[in-house]
Amino acid sequence: MVKYKSRLKEIRQGTGLTIDQVVVATGISKRTIITIENEEGANPSVDTVKRLIKYFEISFEELYP
């Protein structure tokens, strides 16, 4: 099974946002955000990925290159 690493941390930090700001804006739990940012092969739900893509106005390929 191929494991993909998210660019979420890089994208979030590039916008100057804190994890807490992303949590409030997206409704995604802090634990989930931290897991996606720090664990290669994290397996977020489709809904979570869609929320992040919409919030940051990015494509799936930008989040998971």
Segment roles from a protein language model:
Residues M1-G14:
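A short, Lys/Arg-rich alpha-helix, primarily the initiator
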Residues S6, G16-L17, P44-D47:
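Residue-level signal for the short linker/turn that defines the boundary of a DNA-recognition helix
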Residues K9, D20, K50:
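Short glycine-/small-residue-rich flexible loop motifs, especially phosphate/cofactor-binding loops
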